[in-house]
Amino acid sequence: MKLDLYIDKDGQKLRCGYTTGSCAAAAAKAAALILGGETMTSVKIDTPAGLVLDLPVEHCRSYKNKDGTAIGEAAVQKDAGDDPDSTDGIYIYARVSYRNDGKVLIDGGEGIGRITKKGLFGEVGEAAINPVPRQMIEKEVLKVSKKGFNVEIFSPQGAEIGKKTFNKNIGVEGGISIIGTKGIVYPMSEDAIKKTIYLEIDGILQNSEKKEILLVPGNYGEGLKEKLNTIIDLPTVKISNYIGDSLSYAYSKGFKTMTLLGHIGKFAKLSIGIFNTHNRTADTRMEAFVYYLAMHGADKKTIETVNAFLTAEEAFNYLVENKIEMILKAMERGAEERIKKYLKDDSLSIRVLIYSMKYGLIE
């Protein structure tokens, strides 16, 4: 059952989804009902967003474990709507048993990550189940019975899916996190992406003695750092298109030495002062090349040739192949100066490194 809730974003009608926290709460409630002898195909839960979700439940069963304890078990499949969420389609399971003290004890099992660093939402060693989902789970199972429950949340796909998330960088290993502050996934939430970036920076501040940070837009740049001894050991944060927001936050946290490593497609924009590199914000890649070529005395034919390219990758490679890669170095220095102006601090130590997929980093 798909969630019939939509938002309008940049003129597009996008479908919302529900969080892993909502899945866990619904699965736990269903498992508690099963433990009491009920059968169902869906359960209703309240969300912090003020919406009531009616979520389909699957893989329902009741049984006794080896010591004779009665167990209820159920699963809910995550629906991320139109959000590009790596956990979309994953099954979140709950396994519950009764207590007699009215308490609800919640833990994570297979596929649920464990906290490995201080400064997150729980203690080191605890299951990566955020506070709001914990509250949702407790609220829903206590609707079924006031006896209390032991609740184990697990996901057989979680260990593999967790590798595709930001988890390891923020101090969660071994699986996915059960998250969500509203219970609803709002598509392409820029705030959510930025909060993840900020959380990574906070994690580095808490757990690293390094006073320098490496910011990369994506996975390829992170892998490329292995080729540079000067940055190979730097704590790294993937910042997507949010260069300005990430720089400002890192600077506010005391980082005064920062290296940025990125593809020419994004950093051409940065070289002329574009700090959100999403193509809907600005597409000034060729304009950047034209500016730096003109400033360094390139002839009209060269400028026109570069301006006619469709991608920044082509332009980068053309400059290398025609031995005018000094323009690329000028773009790196230009980006560094733009960052200092953006942060209003000329004393910063900023290093910008630009690469192409074909030639890698320029020497």
UniProtKB/Swiss-Prot annotation:
<keyword id="KW-0489">Methyltransferase</keyword>
<dbReference type="GO" id="GO:0019251">
    <property type="term" value="P:anaerobic cobalamin biosynthetic process"/>
</dbReference>
<dbReference type="GO" id="GO:0043780">
    <property type="term" value="F:cobalt-precorrin-5B C1-methyltransferase activity"/>
</dbReference>
<dbReference type="InterPro" id="IPR002748">
    <property type="entry name" value="CbiD"/>
</dbReference>
<dbReference type="InterPro" id="IPR036074">
    <property type="entry name" value="CbiD_sf"/>
</dbReference>
<protein>
    <recommendedName>
        <fullName>Cobalt-precorrin-5B C(1)-methyltransferase</fullName>
        <ecNumber>2.1.1.195</ecNumber>
    </recommendedName>
</protein>
<comment type="similarity">
    <text>Belongs to the CbiD family.</text>
</comment>
<keyword id="KW-0169">Cobalamin biosynthesis</keyword>
<dbReference type="Pfam" id="PF01888">
    <property type="entry name" value="CbiD"/>
</dbReference>
<keyword id="KW-0949">S-adenosyl-L-methionine</keyword>
<comment type="pathway">
    <text>Cofactor biosynthesis; adenosylcobalamin biosynthesis; cob(II)yrinate a,c-diamide from sirohydrochlorin (anaerobic route): step 6/10.</text>
</comment>
<keyword id="KW-0808">Transferase</keyword>
<dbReference type="GO" id="GO:0032259">
    <property type="term" value="P:methylation"/>
</dbReference>
